[in-house]
């Protein structure tokens, strides 16, 4: 989850929390749970929320070597931020889920401010086949699914195709499916609408927060 902007006028409140609590806990863990949870047993909101909780309980505690944090240049000069603040504006973490489905599969979470772009994406890298037909080194870009959640919505499927000619040489391409022509509700407007209708699927339950 990358943001081009800094903390702007929220220096004091942001400095008391940081990227882990503001972004990872509130946003990225929700995305992680939706992406990796088992199918819910019913269509009710509580069924999906139950699966999210079980998923988070299976997340292994993150080791110090798998956690990197930092600040963007100029963060400490923001009004409300202490001159010796150690609060992170960037975080990258590697975690594992101790379940049969996700055993030994590394999952990376990254979030930061003052990044080159503003975008929230999920990148799923597929396992490599036991043998490459082209006999050349193939990067992960040739076998992935990329899901952009914001600011726009699209899905990209990474493939490797043969280049024209006699030689067996491939190149990486990405097929993109873009959602267009549909007016998307602003995020908080959707949440408020769900709250008024009693739909709790997108809300964090207490046991989810504690997990």
Question: What do these predicted regions represent?
Answer:
Residues 1-211:
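Secretory/organelle targeting and membrane-embedding segments
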């Amino acid at each position: 989850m990358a943001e081009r902007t800094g903390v702007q006028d929220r220096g004091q409140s942001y400095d008391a929390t940081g990227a882990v609590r503001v972004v990872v806990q509130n946003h990225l863990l929700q995305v992680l749970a939706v992406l990796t949870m088992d199918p819910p047993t019913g269509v009710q909101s509580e069924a999906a929320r139950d699966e999210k909780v079980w998923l988070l309980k299976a997340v292994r505690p993150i080791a110090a070597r798998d956690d990197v944090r930092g600040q963007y240049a100029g963060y400490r000069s923001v009004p409300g931020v202490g001159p010796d603040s150690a609060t992170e504006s960037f975080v990258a973490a590697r975690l594992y889920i101790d379940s049969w489905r996700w055993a030994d599969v590394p999952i990376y979470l990254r979030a930061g401010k003052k990044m080159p772009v503003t975008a929230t994406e999920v990148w799923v890298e597929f396992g490599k086949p036991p043998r490459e037909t082209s006999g050349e080194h193939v990067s992960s870009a040739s076998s992935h699914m990329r899901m952009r959640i914001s600011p726009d919505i699209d899905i990209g499927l990474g493939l490797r195709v043969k280049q024209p000619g006699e030689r067996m040489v491939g190149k990486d391409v990405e097929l993109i499916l873009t959602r267009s022509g549909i007016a998307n509700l602003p995020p908080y407007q959707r949440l408020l609408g769900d709250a008024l209708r009693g739909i709790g699927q997108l809300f964090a339950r207490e046991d989810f927060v504690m997990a």
